[in-house]
Swiss-Prot record:
GO terms for biological process: tRNA threonylcarbamoyladenosine modification. This is tRNA N6-adenosine threonylcarbamoyltransferase. It comes from Cereibacter sphaeroides (strain ATCC 17023 / DSM 158 / JCM 6121 / CCUG 31486 / LMG 2827 / NBRC 12203 / NCIMB 8253 / ATH 2.4.1.) (Rhodobacter sphaeroides). Belongs to the KAE1 / TsaD family. Fe cation binds at H118, H122, D316. Binds 1 Fe(2+) ion per subunit. It is an enzyme of class 2 (transferase). The gene is tsaD. Required for the formation of a threonylcarbamoyl group on adenosine at position 37 (t(6)A37) in tRNAs that read codons beginning with adenine. Is involved in the transfer of the threonylcarbamoyl moiety of threonylcarbamoyl-AMP (TC-AMP) to the N6 group of A37, together with TsaE and TsaB. TsaD likely plays a direct catalytic role in this reaction.
Length: 364
């Protein structure tokens, strides 16, 4: 069994400033602390994340989050075995703030520095929470990304498909903005949809008529916009029932697309011959109840185990970064002071680039 390792994790790739301390011994891990300082209030008036505001907030809050994480863990820097930091992909200003802080801490303490791919942090979360064995199928679904990945190792991922334009989380945020609902859009749309009729509006299910695991959500946003504008032109505005039905129809379309594409991805994954086949989901949109329920049914029908992280670990956090850093460190990965912030960093470097751009920039 490998020796126990205690890592500090730092995350600042979008609009959550986070720090955490994770201790791992073998396949068992313990989150000693996890501090997340969100920026929702700072961006609320703009209907989305403003990169300049996010970067400034990260620069102001990162050191405070690290201090809190160490204090809550009851540890000092001398008690750590390494420092892991998100080095991309993401909004470059925020990523740079985190990398610079991590470099300073590593230089001052002599601790190993490990740069972590933010997407790997999400993709490896099932190993942090459940000790899931490789290989497993991962659906990474968030505000900036949507990909099917076969995870074979800490740095070995094969992408089966993904969104060629907008990510589902971005589509949820846009839907909320179009309907005058609060941000972030995911929870707002889900809450409204609970009281709505998903059959009232016949929204498209993009790319279900095409083979493969690629997806598209931009046309779904356009269809919702047209439905909204039609109601406004007809009635002069939207009723509460209109909003609920629009949200329900939109959410049902997203759920159906993700479920069908997951079935196809599972068929490809079956060729891996995994001893303990599993489907895992991670990312902020993984907190959506109907999506979780649909994926659970798909996994059960395929005879594979389904795992979804606790809600607090679905959205951006530094515990997943600390864990991914430990995984990479165990595999021999570490970085020097030349570590750079990267706005784009694909997990599967051999896969062709996905078309389009989401909220976090070029698809990674």
């Amino acid at each position: 069994m490998s020796r126990p390792l205690t890592f500090l994790g730092i995350e600042s790739s979008c609009d959550d400033t986070a720090a955490a301390v994770v201790r791992a011994e073998g396949t068992r891990a313990e989150i000693l602390s996890s501090v997340v300082d969100g920026q929702t209030a700072l961006h609320a008036a703009f209907g989305g994340v403003v990169p300049e505001i996010a970067a400034r907030a990260h620069a102001e809050r990162l050191d405070l989050c690290v201090e809190r994480a160490l204090e809550e863990a009851g540890l000092g820097l001398r008690d750590l075995d390494g420092i892991a930091v998100t080095a991309g992909p993401g909004l470059i200003g925020g990523v740079l703030s985190g990398v610079m802080l991590a470099k300073g801490l590593a230089a001052g303490t002599g601790l190993p520095l490990v740069g972590v791919n933010h997407l790997a942090g999400h993709a490896l979360t099932p190993r942090l929470t459940d000790g899931l064995a490789f290989p497993y199928l991962m659906l990474l679904v968030s505000g900036g990304h949507c990909q099917f990945l076969i995870a074979r190792g800490a740095e070995e991922f094969s992408r089966l498909g993904g969104s060629i334009d907008d990510a589902p989380g971005e589509a949820f945020d846009k839907t909320a903005k179009l309907l005058g609902l609060p941000q972030p859009g995911g929870p707002s749309v889900e809450a409204e949809a609970a009281a709505g009729d998903p059959r009232r509006f016949a929204f498209p299910r993009p790319m279900l008529d095409r083979p493969g695991c690629d997806m598209s959500f931009s046309g779904l946003k356009t269809a919702l916009l047209r439905a909204r504008d039609g109601l406004v032109a007809e009635k002069g505005g939207l009723t509460r029932a209109d909003r609920a039905d629009l949200c329900a129809g939109f959410q049902a379309a997203v759920v159906e697309v993700l479920a069908e594409k997951t079935r196809r991805a599972l068929a490809v994954y079956a060729a891996e011959g995994a001893a303990e086949p599993a489907l895992a989901v991670a990312g902020g949109v993984a907190a959506n109840g109907p999506i979780r329920a649909a994926l659970t049914r798909v996994a059960e029908a395929a005879g594979v185990r389904f795992l979804a992280p606790p809600l607090r670990l679905c959205t951006d956090n530094a515990a997943m970064i600390a864990w991914a850093g430990i995984e990479r460190f165990r595999a021999g990965g570490r970085d020097g002071m030349e570590l750079s912030a990267r706005p784009r960093w694909p997990l599967d470097r051999s896969a062709p680039a996905l078309i389009g751009s989401g909220r976090k920039g070029a698809k990674a």
